[in-house]
Amino acid sequence: MLSRRNWLLAASLAAAAPMTGLSRLQPAARPGRTEPGFRIKDIRRTTVALPYRPVPARNMARELPHWVYSEICEVELANGTVGFGETMLYYTWGATSDEDVNFANGKNAAAIMWNDELGAGLQMACFDAVARAIDVPIHALLGKQAHTRTPVAWWDIDLPPEDVAGYTAFKTKGRPWFDIWEQAKQGNAAAPKGFSITFDYNDTLLDAERGIPILKAVEQYPISKMVETPIPQGDILGNQRIRRETKSAVAMHYGNPSPVVAIRQRVCDGFVVGGGANRVMTAGRIAGMADMPFWLQLVGSSITGAWSRQFGAVLSHASWPAVTCFQLYAAQPTKQNVEVRNGFTPIPNAPGLGVELDWKVINQYKVPKPPARPEPERLLETRWPDGRKLYIGSNGNVNYMLRKFMKPSNLPYFEPGVTCHLLMNDGSKDWRDLYQRARRRPVLTR
């Protein structure tokens, strides 16, 4: 027989499982629902290319050089209030299209702001405008405040060991083309007490049989307290085995497998939650009902960092450090940066997002919107101590290197001593020939 608590949980999970169309079912925000002053009078969009800081720059260049591009969206209401938001153009749960702008123009911002189909920047700007118009922080529109500060983590893509040393807390990648044992060792040697590194494997451990020995080796270091997606999330039995046989908490992206399966089958310890406002609030409440922690993963500059804090204010189980990636950038488009102390950032109570745009910075880094995702030619060389070399070239796909290691293949698995770097284009015929071969298929030599 189901207990009352389990029955309520099951019923809520069943109701939340079909995420498609939830934005249309979500009640519109009440403040100003019929007030003409909340009508959207104008929508303006500005593209910027924010420069990376030095360490992220040399590592993001391998697979994610396009993360520098963001679009700032401003929404002006009939009452004169202006709100703003941000879309990271080439890494987002939803980009704001011209069709979305045409749909929103003339509409009541309070009536449409829960519609995740607006895309990141436009939805964020609608919330910001409505909250500013009624002089409250966005979190007052989301629910009752549960926290006055929220945890936040540094994030960067896969790094060689020497770039790990010296950081205080961050989430990074575990990859077959870097020495995971040395990454953990050097990170641990530089870490102060209480420091932790979360390695996101993005499926690359492939299965529990091969992955568990690596996870056990890494978790011997005190800095290793959590892992993300060590093997494919749909491998229920494999993930259950990892949880049984290792100590580190396992985080999975919410929605795969379905929340019903993930919670009932205990395939993870908590979630990674992202997406639009409606999806984030739904996922956060389901996780709270299941008493499972999660981190918010809403990625962008300091604008998105401020947006993430609003959800961290009201979601009780957003207790794992949030990933927003504002730390990657040498310049921020807001006058106020995200202040982080001892792993936490305070939640502002100023109206809207609680930050203001810095037009000096925006105008400095303003660029024409690219017609498509920029795709510079990149050739990666991976080396092993025994002399093997692997060459993989960019081929128009995001994560062109990662994709080749996410499924079983004849490519090398995790090994000690491996390292990877960009092989710069020296203009030679040899480089061009190798690149053309490596972009078609991996080239492994001895």
Predicted regions, residues:
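Metal-dependent enolase-superfamily TIM-barrel catalytic cores that perform enediolate-based chemistry
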Residues: 140-246
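C-terminal extensions of enzymes
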Residues: 335-446
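C-terminal segment of N-terminal export signals and the immediately downstream linker at the start
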Residues: 21-59
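Conserved, mostly hydrophobic/aromatic
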Residues: 80, 135, 227, 308, ...
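Shared catalytic-loop signature of beta/alpha-barrel
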Residues: 104-110, 223, 234-249, 255-357, ...
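Short Gly/Pro-enriched turn/cap motifs at secondary-structure boundaries
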Residues: 61-66, 114
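Metal- or metallocofactor-binding catalytic centers and their adjacent structured scaffolds
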Residues: 36-47, 75-134, 386
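N-terminal export signals
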Residues: 4-27
